[in-house]
Amino acid sequence: MKEYDLICIGTGSAMAVVEAMISENPKAKIAVIDKDKPGGICLTRGCIPSKLLLYPAELVRTIEKARTFGIDSETKNVDFKAVMERMRNIIYKDINKIRQGLSESKHLDYYSEAAEFVAPYTLKVGKKIIKAKMIILGTGSKPLIPPVKGLNETGYLTSDTILEISKLAKS
């Protein structure tokens, strides 16, 4: 069993605590665990992807408003697939940088797999057992699917699945 001063589950906003601890005590033993893509929900399927998609939409709106300034312009086509690929490429670059930084860090051990409590202050990560007196649960959130009759048959998109589409929906 490996013992740590701090175990952090999640690589989003909880990493601020990890960074502060490293800054205060560079010799602290720290484990960071994330079964998903590192970077947290804001980077992987929240704030950042939505902002990257808003910018092209704002450009289209600006082009359409150009007529009010006497500029004859129009948007003939929006390559939705290219817009989505651009967003994904930017995000995956950041995810890969974070993963590399975590994997190569001399200040922490990075576990890219699921964790489960097996005893107080004790986690099983893969086949390893680790322990700490301080454990941060920064595990993010998931979309809530309301119990609407017929919703599953109709089909729906969530804030997670919308980022995976490559063809623009009709409505």
Task: Enumerate the predicted regions with their spans.
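Glycine-rich flavin
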Residues: 2-3, 13-14, 20, 24-28, ...
